[in-house]
Amino acid sequence: LTDPSSIAWVFNIRGNDVSNTPFSLSFAILRAKGRPSLFIDQRKLGESEKQYLARYVDIFEPSALIGEITKEAQSRACFSLDGQLSAEKLRQVIVDHGGTIKDLRDPARLPRAIKNEAELKGSRQAHARDGVALCRFFSWLSRQKPATVDEISAATKLESFRADTALKMGSKLEDLSFDTISGSGSDGAIIHYRVNTATNRPLNEGELYLVDSGAQYRDGTTDVTRTVAIGHAGGQEKLCFTLVLKGMIDLSAARFPKGTRGQDLDVLARIALWKAGLDFAHGTGHGVGSYLAVHEGPQTISKRGGQELLPGMIVSNEPGYYREGAFGIRIENLLVVKPAEPVKGGDIDMLGFETLTLCPIDRNLIAVDMLTNEEREWLNAYHARVMKENAPHLDEVDRKWLEVATQPL
């Protein structure tokens, strides 16, 4: 194994060698027979972790990897390597010393993507506290005068709410799951925008503000995007926002047969935009790890998403629309695939989604008459759940804001 995320998952360890993704730089050899070997800087392991792992695993320093591979190759061993994730140097050592190679996708990718009950419980807990932090942030933002907050200060404030909320709810914010995308006005139209002091701009009256952010907690990883109006929103912004919202809802509410792939569902998030001659130039959704990488495969919801969606997989649902030089819109929730109620009169097993993210969607940007009855019912039910789950953890000011933000359409 050469992917640190897979190694972290297989051995149930985490680290902090890099920002945003809690793994340690490491390698591993998994044998068909015999104990696995883990190659990791042992200074990164506490004594209790060393003692526990040593019962099942041979632990080496990373510098020992080439020597161990050489010994195995000299015994004519056959190695399975993921060609997309392994260095050419490893392949060369194996071949030069008499070993053979079988190209195989990382065997941990699929089981890692199918979350077990403990991982799903942790993800729900992580999203519960994340939802409270998001409500506190958007409540605070609604009370600020336009142009008194900028992209950097907004992102910093959101992180502080996450850290404070986690402590109040008996947890800890370990890290962000990626650098926050905090884009006001035309900056929101840059899909992977990263604010810096040179590009930082205020949140101005009459503009849209797009914030795509996520957190790493010990029990789960979050990723959420909301687009809100700063002051009054124009008619074109409302129209485009509602088209994006329709796609997000239609995918969230989908029921589909077993064997369905991500590419089979991608159109649900786009069809409303297509009817208006619009689209977005990115995938609709990606897999998400369990206190691991915020982008995780093999599942995606995209035009190239060939992996079957299986119960327990977490995927993002994030359609958008971006008008260059003017505004950007994206609405993102995380979903988990789960068995769905049978269709009355049907005769096949169906799957659907549970929404994990618990944060209001800006009602001020919705053209209600563009929604179908089913879409309106879905959003009202979602907002009722957001209110129920978040309200007990909010003070009076934030709770009153949430009551307004989640009023039925």
Q: What do the PLM-derived regions correspond to, one by one?
A:
Residues 1-409:
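Active-site neighborhoods and metal-handling regions in enzymes and metal-associated proteins
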